[in-house]
Amino acid sequence: MALLPSLLTALVVYELWPCGALGCDLPQNHILVSRKNFVLLGQMSRISSAICLKDRKDFRFPQDMADGRQFPEAQAASVLHEMLQQIFSLFHTERSSAAWNTTLLDELCTGLLRQLEDLDTCLEQEMGEEESALGTVRPTLAVKRYFRGIHLYLKEKKYSDCAWEIVRMEIMRSFSSSANLQGRLRMKDGDLGSP
């Protein structure tokens, strides 16, 4: 399956990506929580994705999100926050609870909340700087459109097991792509991503 090698590549990039030397300070454990969330998404698989091939869909992940270098730091933090918020909203629903192992789902949602809290602090730091909030509107709208498409897909497929599996794999892809955005943010108390 072509998706697995790209996920593994993204995870390796995520593990090795140097955290930038910019002004947003994230706690040192932020990257560890992010890695754990990625692993939890992998563990949540309940059915073989091979039986869901007919349900595959290109959700059109915003390609400019895959390369975090084109965003100023305030935008990177804002876009990452929006992505994590949308992922949390997707998995923190009654329909999602019915589809997944609730223990893994609860761990994932707790980890996402921790990351969101870290980014809230980061965004508060950035608000005092010159970057205007208007500069973050276009990228965050692209993220919202992307997730709206995922929600519509689930609804069209009547929240079937295969639809949830396809969405889980897509979220893993978008989550691993967010590593580039996280790479723009400096880790407090040392860079875990530095070689």
From Swiss-Prot:
List of glycosylated residues: 101
A Gene Ontology molecular function term of the record: type I interferon receptor binding
InterPro entries the record matches: 4_helix_cytokine-like_core (IPR009079), Interferon_alpha/beta/delta (IPR000471)
UniProt subcellular location: Secreted
Family annotation (Pfam families): Interferon (PF00143)
GO process terms (BP): adaptive immune response; B cell activation involved in immune response; defense response to virus; humoral immune response; natural killer cell activation involved in immune response; response to exogenous dsRNA; T cell activation involved in immune response; type I interferon-mediated signaling pathway
Keywords: Antiviral defense, Cytokine, Disulfide bond, Glycoprotein, Secreted, Signal
CDD domains documented for this protein: IFab
Signal peptide (from-to): 1-23
SS bond partners: 24-122, 52-162
GO cellular component, as recorded: extracellular space
Keyword Signal: yes
Family, as annotated: Belongs to the alpha/beta interferon family.
Protein name as annotated: Interferon omega-2
Lineage summary: Eukaryota, Metazoa, Chordata, Craniata, Vertebrata
